[in-house]
Amino acid sequence: MSLNTTFTKEDGTEVVIPFNGSQNGHPENEEPEVEEAAEPSSSVETLCGATRGDIIVMKHTTKALTELIERLLHSDEFEVRRCSNGQIISQGRCNGTTPGNGIGGGGASSEELEKALKDRDAARAEADKLHANYATLFASFNTVREAANDIRGEYEDARDKLKLAAAEVDEWQAKFLAVKDNANSELERASVEYDDLLRSHDENTKGLRLRVKRQEIELSSKNDEIKVLTNRVSELSQICDQLLNDVDVSDGMSVISTDA
């Protein structure tokens, strides 16, 4: 879209005034405010239905219309073009107003001047509307940018907390692994001790069983000896009784023989 302004002189020649972004105190190398403000929150693609490109175009369009209105106010020559397609709406030349004479002749007619003034007022109203829309969009953009900064701060806090939680989890995991290794070593040691005790118990049990068996055998042999000795005592007792009876009989016979 061309924003250059063309004026027609009295001799019929056309003078084209190129659009310069450094007019009205704006340096050429100055970047649009919207672009600078959009850098902290590049993730916001649309704002109130308008993209960043729409906002930038609206800003430059507003600036161009403002400059055009200023040139119309301070120039006798005028030309009104549409910003959308560059179509010439009206052009001509008007005389300056001096005290006492009003609008002089020679140049554009009153109808053309009135039409140009109406077009100027319409362009000014459109520029004011665009400027108001731009201000509203810029305020909304600042609100969104502040919200994005708040979200970014919350994200940073959450990330720091997540790092602390991850470090704490790693610490607890290291402690758990240490306790697990200690428990495994203690379990292995207890298992070895249990196996040793079980083997010792089996050996002791076998030894005790052998001793019991040997004692049982010895007891059985002792019982057999006791039985044999008991039988011998019984036999000796019978023999003693028989001998005593025989002694008594022989004593009785001796007494009888003596009496005779």
Swiss-Prot record:
GO biological process, one term: embryo development ending in birth or egg hatching
Pfam families to which the protein is assigned, alphabetical: TACC_C (PF05010)
Keywords assigned by UniProt, alphabetized: Cell cycle, Cell division, Cell projection, Centromere, Chromosome, Coiled coil, Cytoplasm, Cytoskeleton, Kinetochore, Meiosis, Microtubule, Mitosis
Disulphide bridges: none
InterPro entries registered for this protein in UniProt: TACC_C (IPR007707)
Molecular function (Gene Ontology), one example: protein domain specific binding
Coiled-coil ranges (or none): 108-249
Disruption phenotype: Maternal-effect embryonic lethal. RNAi-mediated knockdown results in a meiotic defect in 30% of early embryos and defective microtubule related processes during the first cell cycle in early embryogenesis. In one-cell embryos, the maternal pronuclei fail to migrate and the breakdown of the pronuclear envelope is delayed.
Protein function: Involved in microtubule formation, polymerization and assembly, regulating microtubule nucleation and length. Plays a role in pronuclear migration and mitotic and meiotic spindle elongation during early embryogenesis. In complex with zyg-9, functions during the early stages of embryonic development to regulate microtubule assembly throughout the cell cycle. Specifically, the complex is required for the formation and growth of astral microtubules and spindle microtubules during mitotic spindle assembly.
UniProt similarity note: Belongs to the TACC family.
Protein name: Transforming acid coiled-coil-containing protein 1
Species this chain originates from: Caenorhabditis elegans
